[in-house]
Amino acid sequence: MTRVLGIETSCDETAAAVVTRGADEAPAILSNVVLSQIEEHAAFGGVVPEIAARAHVEALDGVIEAALAEAALSLDEVDAIAATAGPGLIGGLIVGLTTAKAIAAALGKPLLPVNHLEGHALTARLTDRLEFPYLLLLVSGGHTQIVHVAGVGRYERWASTIDDALGEAFDKTAKLLGLPYPGGPNVEKAAAEGDPARFAFPTPLKGEARPDFSFSGLKTAVRRAAGELAPLSEQDVADLCASFQFAVTQTLADRVARSLERFGKEHPKLQQPALVVAGGVAANAAVRGTLEDLCRKKGFRLVAPPLNLCGDNAAMIAWAGLERLESGLKQEGALAFAPRPRWPLDESAAPLFGAGKRGAKA
């Protein structure tokens, strides 16, 4: 039995977890502790990197202790240490990776620097024991990507956003409409009380052959509609959110369909290919419902993590570390590995350019 301690500090969650794979090959989460910084950043309407880094410094030791206690383990009983080394906010990455290095060096245990995006990419194998290959739709505050996942460390990016990430569009829409931080969940909550047919927002890139995404025009349409209605009533806000969210789901359905078709052609012998949706936006019920309908029509199975594993967490980091350890992909010179604020999952792909491809977590 291999037990890996995972540490995640790439943005505004301080997290630690212990994950294992038993003799029966079944993975298990022994603990998963996440301390959010929502209160620290709420007054600013978004994450302030300096505040986030300081909060990680103050909280990380206690979070690690809590994860070990929940797993009923001591540090000596952990077999390896995995930590997010990028992409993300540099201050937070330094805190988590430096702590992991200190623990690994003191105990003489392997250190596994993990790409945060790989954590999301492999979560479905932790929760559903999914076999390779599969298609990944990664939707979060920093990313909107479609990735072909052929194995551990074997990723090919098929599509990405040409401007804003989807989670970023949710957050900016929330801020525009005066909704509190975090934006995504509050837009979804308001949308539940709104009329999605009131505003006919655009479906960016609809019908285009390329599979990429675009969300900046949708965000601009919301701003224009809100400006024409100002001052906004509570129902106006709800209707704007509902119409925005509906346009998002229609955009996803149109864009993702192209990659599903390509995947089916490249893997014709798979009886029921899988689409994995991961990242914070994967917690949105409307997004999940739309993708379920799309997969049903295309002969795919939708695999979505439990809600507590959609956002940033350390269980996915520990699991990615365990997968790399078992695949013989240990990082040479890990103790000297520098945090990487920009670290693409598919390092062979062309660099991302443009306002929404600025790479904070690309």
Curated annotation (Swiss-Prot):
Q: What CDD domains does the entry give?
A: ASKHA_NBD_TsaD_bac
One example of a Gene Ontology biological process annotation: tRNA threonylcarbamoyladenosine modification
Q: Name one Pfam family in it.
A: TsaD
* Cofactor detail note: Binds 1 Fe(2+) ion per subunit.
Q: What would be an example GO MF term here?
A: N(6)-L-threonylcarbamoyladenine synthase activity
Catalytic activity entry: L-threonylcarbamoyladenylate + adenosine(37) in tRNA = N(6)-L-threonylcarbamoyladenosine(37) in tRNA + AMP + H(+)
Q: Which cofactors are required for activity?
A: Fe(2+)
Sorted keywords for this record are: Acyltransferase, Cytoplasm, Iron, Metal-binding, Transferase, tRNA processing
- What GO cellular component entries does it have? cytoplasm
Q: Which family does it belong to?
A: Belongs to the KAE1 / TsaD family.
- What's this protein's function? Required for the formation of a threonylcarbamoyl group on adenosine at position 37 (t(6)A37) in tRNAs that read codons beginning with adenine. Is involved in the transfer of the threonylcarbamoyl moiety of threonylcarbamoyl-AMP (TC-AMP) to the N6 group of A37, together with TsaE and TsaB. TsaD likely plays a direct catalytic role in this reaction.
HAMAP family referenced in this protein's UniProt entry, alphabetically: TsaD
Q: What is this protein called?
A: tRNA N6-adenosine threonylcarbamoyltransferase
Q: Which organism is it from?
A: Chelativorans sp. (strain BNC1)
Lineage start: Bacteria, Pseudomonadati, Pseudomonadota, Alphaproteobacteria, Hyphomicrobiales
